[in-house]
Amino acid sequence: MPKKNEAPASFETALGELEQIVNRLESGDLPLEEALSEFERGVQLARQGQSQLQKAEQRVQILLADSEDSPTTPFTPDAE
């Protein structure tokens, strides 16, 4: 597992690590301190992933804005 301050190599790597953390937390077998540490790392990974997704969204909007043939509309995620 990467150190707490170490950024994952990619979005996919972070997502995979986050899934493993969720599985370990859901098992209920971790001692409290270890569960808190895992939760903290999970929050960090989720924030990094959200940031990466926002940057990717901005890049897509910029690329689409460069195309004069098709108008663009801001992305709005579906409410779940």
Swiss-Prot record:
Q: Which GO terms describe its molecular function?
A: exodeoxyribonuclease VII activity
The record describes its quaternary structure and partners as: Heterooligomer composed of large and small subunits.
GO (cellular component) term, any one: exodeoxyribonuclease VII complex
Keyword set, alphabetical order: Cytoplasm, Exonuclease, Hydrolase, Nuclease
Q: What class of enzyme is it?
A: hydrolase
Under what name is this protein listed? Exodeoxyribonuclease 7 small subunit
Q: Is Thylakoid one of the keywords UniProt gives this record?
A: no
The similarity annotation says: Belongs to the XseB family.
Q: Which GO biological process entries does UniProt record here? A: DNA catabolic process
Q: Which compartments does it reside in?
A: Cytoplasm
Question: Could you tell me what reaction this enzyme catalyses?
Answer: Exonucleolytic cleavage in either 5'- to 3'- or 3'- to 5'-direction to yield nucleoside 5'-phosphates
Protein's job: Bidirectionally degrades single-stranded DNA into large acid-insoluble oligonucleotides, which are then degraded further into small acid-soluble oligonucleotides.
Q: What is its EC number?
A: 3.1.11.6
Q: Name one Pfam family in it.
A: Exonuc_VII_S
Gene3D superfamilies recorded: Exonuclease VII, small subunit (1.10.287.1040)
Residue stretches in coiled coil: none
